[in-house]
Amino acid sequence: MASEIFGIAAVFWVLIPVGLLGGVLLLKLQGD
C-alpha cells in the first residue's frame, strides 16, 4: 500500500509542474 501511495505522489509531483508550465506557455502563445 505504501508503494502505491508513493507512486501516486510521484506522478502528482511530475504532473503538477508540467501542467503549470504548459498553462503558462499556452497563455503566452495566446497573448501573442
UniProtKB/Swiss-Prot annotation:
GO cellular component, one term: plasma membrane-derived thylakoid membrane
InterPro entries reported for this sequence: PetM_cyt_b6/f_cplx_su7
Protein's membrane topology: Single-pass membrane protein
Main function: Component of the cytochrome b6-f complex, which mediates electron transfer between photosystem II (PSII) and photosystem I (PSI), cyclic electron flow around PSI, and state transitions.
Organism from which the protein derives: Prochlorococcus marinus (strain NATL2A)
Ranges annotated as spanning the membrane: 5-25
Stored Pfam families: PetM
Subunit structure comment from the entry: The 4 large subunits of the cytochrome b6-f complex are cytochrome b6, subunit IV (17 kDa polypeptide, PetD), cytochrome f and the Rieske protein, while the 4 small subunits are PetG, PetL, PetM and PetN. The complex functions as a dimer.
A Gene Ontology BP annotation from the UniProt entry: photosynthesis
Localization per Swiss-Prot or TrEMBL: Cellular thylakoid membrane
Source superkingdom: Bacteria
Keywords attached to this entry: Electron transport, Membrane, Photosynthesis, Thylakoid, Transmembrane, Transmembrane helix, Transport
Protein name as it appears in the record: Cytochrome b6-f complex subunit 7
UniProt record similarity statement: Belongs to the PetM family.
GO molecular function, one term: electron transfer activity
